[in-house]
Amino acid sequence: MKPSIYGLTRDELIAWAIDNGQKAFRATQIWDWLYRKRVQSFDEMTNISKEFVAILKDSFCINPLKQRVAQESADGTVKYLFELPDGMLIETVLMRQHYGQSVCVTTQVGCNIGCTFCASGLIKKQRDLNSGEITAQIMMVQNYFDKRAQDERVSHVVVMGIGEPFDNYQNVMTFLRTINDDHGLAIGARHITVSTSGLAHKIREFANEGVQVNLAVSLHAPNNELRSSIMRINRSFPLDKLFSAIEYYIETTNRRVTFEYIMLNKVNDGVEQAQELADLTKRIRKLSYVNLIPYNPVSEHDQYSRSPKERVAAFYDILKKNGVNCVVRQEHGTDIDAACGQLRSNTMKKDRQKAAAART
């Protein structure tokens, strides 16, 4: 399978065009066709010579994804299941917010982080997505908007889908630079958030990139004992190492960090744990924010359930009394396969059942 041209940054496309005997402006024209006019075929690039179109077609495909499933929620959330060229499946989610249209992208096929409450890790990591496959997720949603012809655009991106983004660091950074490029989709850096489970060394590297992209950290527990029991990554990067990296990030960038905290009934949602969380984040309170997330139950992880509203409210109140900036996250798509990785997992089960039935 040819690589997707979406996998190149504009500078890389310019370098490639020059290597193939073209002027730099030719690459800029191609970039415009891809991201402003959003063509789906190189033949639609009418100001590019037929000879160079032939070279493009020999070298690249445009969009490597096929849509397998699209589930639309009553609130307008759309969960997509896309098929990659090798037949593997990934999820992408469109969330309609009051401030714009936000897309959550996947960065890996499967996940090795091993969070015990998460559907994404039910299937171990099989491979990284390349930058073209990550960018193509945004383009698939934008193409959906274009067909609706209602002047909608992807305005916000969260890198919070299946996989650990910082375990696929270079492809994610290429993706970020591509969607942020002013000559293309021009999605503002401050409208993009990358979430990590806590790879401390990569948080430090990200701090040195000089990008204005937001950072979120999946925390989910306020002490090492509990965090290690529900998030295996904490055994490699315990809270002291993680918070040292976070403090370095804040000192280097002067940017706020968001902590994601999923509310698991009678696991991590007690008032004592709320106080521990307030104490843990005290030193960086001015440049941190806590996002309390209602849990979407996963059948394979039935030891966990959603915290009742009363427990969430009590937890929230403790944080607020301690001066912690926090919010309870708005839910999206609760009437579809809402948990991250759930649609993919359920579809793969159905595919296996169909295959087994066909053999009998």
Swiss-Prot record:
Function of the protein: Specifically methylates position 2 of adenine 2503 in 23S rRNA and position 2 of adenine 37 in tRNAs.
Record EC number: 2.1.1.192
Root EC class: transferase
Family, as annotated: Belongs to the radical SAM superfamily. RlmN family.
Binding site for S-adenosyl-L-methionine: 163-164, 195, 218-220, 296
Organism: Streptococcus equi subsp. equi (strain 4047)
NCBIfam families, A to Z: rRNA_mod_RlmN
Name of the featured protein: Probable dual-specificity RNA methyltransferase RlmN
Pfam families found in the cross-reference section: Radical_SAM (PF04055), RlmN_N (PF21016)
Cofactor: [4Fe-4S] cluster
Alphabetical UniProt keywords: 4Fe-4S, Cytoplasm, Disulfide bond, Iron, Iron-sulfur, Metal-binding, Methyltransferase, rRNA processing, S-adenosyl-L-methionine, Transferase, tRNA processing
Active site annotation, chain numbering: 91 (proton acceptor), 340 (s-methylcysteine intermediate)
Principal place of residence: cytoplasm
Reactions mediated catalytically: adenosine(2503) in 23S rRNA + 2 reduced [2Fe-2S]-[ferredoxin] + 2 S-adenosyl-L-methionine = 2-methyladenosine(2503) in 23S rRNA + 5'-deoxyadenosine + L-methionine + 2 oxidized [2Fe-2S]-[ferredoxin] + S-adenosyl-L-homocysteine; adenosine(37) in tRNA + 2 reduced [2Fe-2S]-[ferredoxin] + 2 S-adenosyl-L-methionine = 2-methyladenosine(37) in tRNA + 5'-deoxyadenosine + L-methionine + 2 oxidized [2Fe-2S]-[ferredoxin] + S-adenosyl-L-homocysteine
Disulfide bridge positions per record: 104-340
Note on how the cofactor is bound: Binds 1 [4Fe-4S] cluster. The cluster is coordinated with 3 cysteines and an exchangeable S-adenosyl-L-methionine.
GO cellular component, one term: cytoplasm
Extra remark beyond the main annotation: Reaction proceeds by a ping-pong mechanism involving intermediate methylation of a conserved cysteine residue.
Domain called Radical SAM core: residue spans: 97-335
GO annotation terms (biological process): rRNA base methylation; tRNA methylation
Cited SUPFAM superfamilies: Radical SAM enzymes
Residue numbers binding [4Fe-4S] cluster: 111, 115, 118
Top-rank taxon: Bacteria
Localization in the cell: Cytoplasm
Molecular functions (GO terms): 4 iron, 4 sulfur cluster binding; metal ion binding; rRNA (adenine(2503)-C2-)-methyltransferase activity; rRNA binding; tRNA (adenine(37)-C2)-methyltransferase activity; tRNA binding
